[in-house]
Each structure stands twice: as C-alpha cells, then as structure tokens.
Amino acid sequence: GIQDLHGIYQGEKLGLELEYFLDKHNPALAMLPAPFSREEVDTITEEQLTDKTRVKSLRQQLMKETVPLLLDGESEYLIVDFYDFHNYIFSYKDTAFGTQANEFCGTALGKKYKEELQAWNLFQLPTWVLYGMVDRFFDTIMQKFDADHIILNRFWTNAMMLFKDGKVGLIPEECKQPFQCHEKYNVNCFNLEQHIIDKYHPYVIDLSRYFIGDANIWDNWNASHFEREFYRETYDQIIRIITKQADEKYFDKVRFFDSSRPGYQEDKERKFDVEWGIQLFEQFVENNNDLWKNMLDKLLVYAP
C-alpha cells in the first residue's frame, strides 16, 4: 500500500525504515486459501481501480501473501490493527477475501464472479470461530515476532466529526458504506482486541476512542478518518516503543491540555463553536463517553 501514513510518518529521520504498509490486509482472511489463480489476479490493473495506489495491495491480499511477506521480510516490529474487520468481505467457494474498500468490485475479475460472491462481515461469525481464525494468524506470525515486537493499535470507529463551520456533529449515515467502518462493530472489535491482548500480550496503543473526524483535513468523510492529532500521538508512541523509550506496554494517555503538543497551534486555526462544544462536553460527561476529554481540550484551546 501507499506508505505516507496520512502524512505523519517520519521514521526515516530516526533511522527507521517502513518495510511494508499492508493496506487493508485482514489477519483472519490471511490464513485462508487464495480464491483465484495467479493468472486471474494479474489481470487486475491500475486502470480498473478508483484508487490506483491499491492495485499492489489488492493483488497481495487476493493471493494471500500477507503472512509470507511478514515471515520472509526483514522487519523487526509488526504493527497491526483490526480496522478491516469492520468492512464487509466476500465468500467464494471454500474461502473468503476482502474487497480493498470495494475496489475489487470494479475490476473485470470482480464482475466475472459477481453472481458467485456472498457479501458479509466477519463479526457475524460466532466468537469461537472468529477468534480461532485470528489466533491462527498470531500463532503463525509469532514464529518471527515475539510479544515485545508486536504493537496492536486499537481501533474504535468514530461517529462524530468537526465540520468546517466549527460544529461537531454525527457523521452522516450515507457516508458509512458497507465497505467502510461503522461504530456498530466497535464492541465486537474491542472484545476481539482484548482477546488478543490477554492471550498474546503485545504492546498496545489505545487512543482512537478519544478522537473524532475532521472535515478540515478529510474530503472523504468516513468513520475511520480522524483528527491529525490522533495520528501524531499514535506514531509518537510507535517510535517510543521501537526506540525502547516506553516503560509501559499499554498506552492510553493523550497529550490533551498541553499547549506544547505539536498540533496545538494548528488546532487554533480551525473554527470551533464554543457554545455548541459546551453542550457536547456536558453530554459526553453524563454518558461517560471518552470524548469528553477531547471536547474539554478544544474548549481550553478556543476559549481559555
């Protein structure tokens, strides 16, 4: 996949190299048989895709190359999230595969087999089946990466966005397609993550539940796109872990209420409706929603 990581990744400045960015590769599906032959998969070209950068990653996940790439590579650390579990997949004969944000459906190969494909979500499976599939991935991958070299980035789909008029509101339902994330799967994803944490003990970064979307930086509104500060905070912790500066294995603290954080001045340039924010802050506190910290931080930035 494309390796700019939302414009935040700067590991090369620290002597770090990103070997692979395996975009939308699903750990459970990675352990299943390839649905099509190499010759068929090779017919997929950039011209058939809306997002041309996804052609390589789409071919890789159709050929089930995820695990071989990781095992045969030179990477010392594996960073994984369960984002793709939110998105619908296809069953075909004795296997299943992801759609690469629906890109597969527009290919000649996707159109050829359209009538033979069944769309569904992995969270429809009983936990004993799904967890077993994911365990198989981790059991295999831990032949190379031990618990101190795997970083699980927990993923809590956001339901809200800061719009350009300064108000924070719900992301419109029409922006939540079956091939995109939806907050209805958050509890399922949280429980799956907790299972992996309890069983395999990786490093954990748990920050997404504190952030919302931002229409100032995302034209493509969907529930997996966050404020830029989320990416900064996440990558800062990844760097801390890899450079062995982290004492804890579970990180869930955000640098809110800190005017020295990198995005503070950038945040001040956005519009923010303070009165509306006060109402939301009170609602979040009343509902024990973790976003109360985010909203209080914004109130202190825009109305100190």
Walk through the language-model features, giving the residues of each.
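Serine-esterase "nucleophile elbow" of acetyl-processing enzymes
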Residues: 1-43
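Oxyanion-hole/transition-state-stabilizing segment in secreted/luminal serine hydrolases
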Residues: 48-124, 156-165
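Substrate-gating cap/lid alpha-helix
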Residues: 160-206
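Acidic carboxylate-rich catalytic motifs and surrounding loops in phosphoryl-/glycosyl-chemistry enzymes
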Residues: 154-156, 200-219, 249-258
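Well-ordered, non-membrane alpha-helical segments in soluble/globular domains
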Residues: 59-64, 123-139, 178-194, 228-235
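Short, solvent-exposed loop/turn segments at secondary-structure junctions
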Residues: 1-4, 83-87, 155-160, 209-213, ...
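Histidine-centered active-site loop/cap adjacent to the catalytic His
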Residues: 218-270
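Surface-exposed cleft-lining segments at the edges of enzyme active sites
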Residues: 49-54, 104-137, 170-183, 222
